Amino acid sequence: MQIRPYRPQQDYRAVLNAQCDLYKINFPRFVCTPAFLADQAQRLRAAAKRPFENGIFVLEDGLDFAGYVWVAIRMDLQGTYGSVDQVYLQDSYRRRGLGKLLMGAAHDFVTKQGIKVARLYVTAGNQDAVRLYEREGYAVTRLEMEKPLT
């Protein structure tokens, strides 16, 4: 297994195709449409053009794509932070401790820029991801609540 920086010409299709799976894991009623993929493609191309603001790292198993992590540098009223936006592993690579490797790549990207805080959002029902993030030292700082209005 090897983690390396994203190479647009080599990795674009694999990372883009993983978007549908990633969203289905987190949003069970999600339907992957051409419009969704077009939007994600635009985001991915834009991120690749700003390598100091976006770290995208690919996990390879030999020549096979196994997953990736996407972290962005952001700023709000509390200061600058690393936002771990996406962590994805193909199904056959899950529950093998590889998420920790991807998180390490994200954290390294952030700390090399002198930033001392990383944040992320996780869907409450994605308990595998919640456990990974808790093991990595993340703690709940805010709760987002929702009420369907009929």
Could you tell me what each predicted segment is?
Residues 119-129, 146-150:
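Conserved beta-strand-loop-alpha-helix junction that forms the acyl-donor binding cleft
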Residues 45-58:
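A short helix-loop-beta-strand connector motif used in the catalytic cores of GNAT acetyltransferases and
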Residues 23-45:
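Conserved GNAT-fold acetyl-CoA-binding loop/helix
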Residues 103, 110-121:
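Conserved GNAT acetyl-CoA-binding A-motif
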Residues 100, 124-142:
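Conserved active-site alpha-helix within GNAT-family acetyltransferase domains
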Residues 93, 97-105:
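Conserved acetyl-CoA pyrophosphate-binding loop and the N-cap/start of the following alpha-helix
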Residues 58, 64-73, 83, 88:
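Conserved beta-strand in the GNAT
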Residues 1-17, 28:
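A short beta-loop-alpha structural element at the N-terminal edge
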